Amino acid sequence: MTSQGSAYSRFQRSLTTGNLQLIEAAAAELPKVSLEDALAILIVLAQRGDPRFERAAARWVGRLLTETPAGLSDARFALALVERLPACRDALHGLARRR
């Protein structure tokens, strides 16, 4: 297994724990956190009621707009969904998968 595969496996396992310290440490080992992986982290922040959630949510929507062909209506939709996390995760995953 490559070191990146190993790092990504650790990251995936950390997400299942919901432990933000483990998640942050594992994410720091990755060369880049994908938009979908960033959403997974955002969902954990929402579940935990973490005070960093709002800023992280704004950054995530910004990434959505720059990394996908999303437009203004998608941005409004994404903001509405992000405010309802973790309930609307599937719809947000769908937006993140657009290429």
Task: Explain the meaning of each model-derived region.
Residues 1-99:
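Long, low-complexity, acidic Ser/Pro- and Gly-enriched intrinsically disordered regions
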